Structure formats: C-alpha cells, structure tokens
C-alpha cells in the first residue's frame, strides 16, 4: 500500500469536492459527470505510453461504459443523476483496485490504484451524501 498515493488522493478528493459543489436546487451540473467521463483517458494514455495496444483496446471497451454512465447521469433528474454518479465513482474505485485482476496495462504506474481509487471512493461517498440531502429536501417540500 502506497501511503503517499493514498494521502495525495485524499487531499485531491477534498479539494475537488470543495471546488465542485453541487447546487442544492435546479439541474445536475456537468462537473461531476464530465470528471467521471475523463477517467478512462488516463488508462488510455498509460496504454499508449507503454505501446500496449491490446491493453488500449480493452481500456477503450471498458471506458465506453464510464463515458456512457456519465452521459446518462447528466441527462437524468438531479437525484437519479447523483445516484448514478455515486455508482460510477465507487464502481471506478473498485475498477482501479481490481484492474490488474482483469488485465494488465503495463503503462499504469504502481501507485495509481491507490491514488485514483481513493479519489473515486471519496467523491462517490460525497455524491451519495449530496443525493441523500437532495432526496431529504425534496421529500420535505
């Protein structure tokens, strides 16, 4: 376990969640869906840097799921969008940690699963909290 990667990811997740606040009213903003949609690009770049085009092909196939989920979340009502994003971010954290069990992308840095995984998990939990507050407010009128 790379403690430095975990700490850096934790700090970055807090910075992101404080900068990209979700408004309490209105539609879903594009920030969190767009951020989730960019995550596959990192793995694509890792595969390209290692000249591993088999891994690139697999990463593109998997990445299409995250991009589609982001788009669908953006199109839905705020509460449903937040729930979909929560699933997306937490799911991507699991993907980061279990990535090497699925296939090897030789360009991925050793510290990446901890770094990206903690960011994804923290943002997913933050969005779950925001979804619960949003649902509570809408049910109380």
Where in this protein do the model-derived segments appear?
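Hydrophobic transmembrane alpha-helical segments in integral membrane proteins
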Residues: 1-12, 52-55
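N-terminal signal-anchor/start-transfer transmembrane helix
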Residues: 6-25
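Hydrophobic cores of alpha-helical transmembrane segments in multi-pass inner/ER membrane proteins
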Residues: 9-15, 65-68, 118-130
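Juxtamembrane "helix-exit" motif on the non-cytosolic side of transmembrane helices
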Residues: 19-24, 45-50, 97-105
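Membrane-interface helix-boundary motifs at transmembrane edges
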Residues: 20-32, 51-54, 75-79, 133-140
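Cytoplasmic-side transmembrane-helix entry/capping segments in multi-pass membrane proteins
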Residues: 26-38, 58-62, 82-91
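A loop-to-helix transmembrane entry motif
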Residues: 47-64, 113
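Membrane-helix boundary connector in multi-pass membrane proteins
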Residues: 76-83, 87, 95-112
């Amino acid at each position: 376990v790379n403690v430095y990667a975990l700490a850096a990811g934790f700090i970055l997740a807090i910075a992101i969640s404080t900068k990209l606040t979700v408004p309490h009213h209105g539609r879903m903003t594009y920030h969190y869906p767009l951020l989730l949609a960019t995550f596959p690009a990192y793995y694509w770049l890792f595969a390209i840097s290692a000249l591993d085009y088999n891994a690139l092909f697999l990463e593109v196939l998997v990445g299409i799921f995250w991009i589609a989920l982001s788009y669908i979340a953006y199109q839905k009502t705020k509460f449903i969008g937040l729930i979909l994003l929560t699933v997306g971010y937490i799911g991507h954290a699991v993907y980061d940690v279990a990535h090497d069990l699925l296939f090897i992308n030789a360009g991925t840095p050793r510290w990446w699963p901890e770094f990206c995984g903690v960011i994804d998990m923290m943002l997913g939990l933050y969005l779950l909290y925001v979804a619960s507050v949003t649902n509570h407010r809408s049910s109380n009128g």
